[in-house]
């Protein structure tokens, strides 16, 4: 789920993108 949402959230929220990339 995080992988799919990560792509969508990454564009909307850069902070979440960085957090997901680190995880």
UniProtKB/Swiss-Prot annotation:
Gene Ontology MF, one: toxin activity
Record function comment: Heterodimer protein that may serve both defensive (pain-inducing) and predatory (insecticidal) roles. Has membrane-disrupting activity and shows induction of non-specific calcium influx into cells,. Shows broad-spectrum activity against a diverse range of bacteria, and cell lines, as well as hemolytic activity (EC(50)=2.18 uM). In vivo, shows moderate insecticidal activity against D.melanogaster and potent anthelmintic activity against the veterinary nematode H.contortus. In addition, intraplantar injection into mice induces nocifensive behavior and mechanical allodynia.
A Gene Ontology biological process term: defense response to bacterium
Modified residues (Glutamine amide): 23
Miscellaneous note of the record: Dekan et al., 2017 and Nixon et al., 2020 report synthesis and functional analysis of heterodimers with different disulfide patterns as well as different A and B chain monomeric forms.
Protein name: M-myrmeciitoxin-Mp2b
Source organism, top-level taxon: Eukaryota
Family classification: Belongs to the formicidae venom precursor-01 superfamily. Ant pilosulin family.
Self-association state and partner proteins as the record states: Heterodimer with M-MIITX-Mp2a (pilosulin-3a) (AC Q26464); disulfide-linked. Only heterodimers (and not monomers) have been identified in the venom.
Predominant place of localization: secreted
Compartments in which it is found: Secreted
Tissue expression summary: Expressed by the venom gland.
Presence of keyword Secreted: yes
Cellular component terms per the entry's GO annotation: extracellular region
Species this chain originates from: Myrmecia pilosula (Jack jumper ant)
């Amino acid at each position: 789920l995080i992988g799919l949402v990560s792509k969508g959230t990454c564009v909307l929220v850069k902070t979440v993108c960085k957090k997901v990339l680190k995880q």
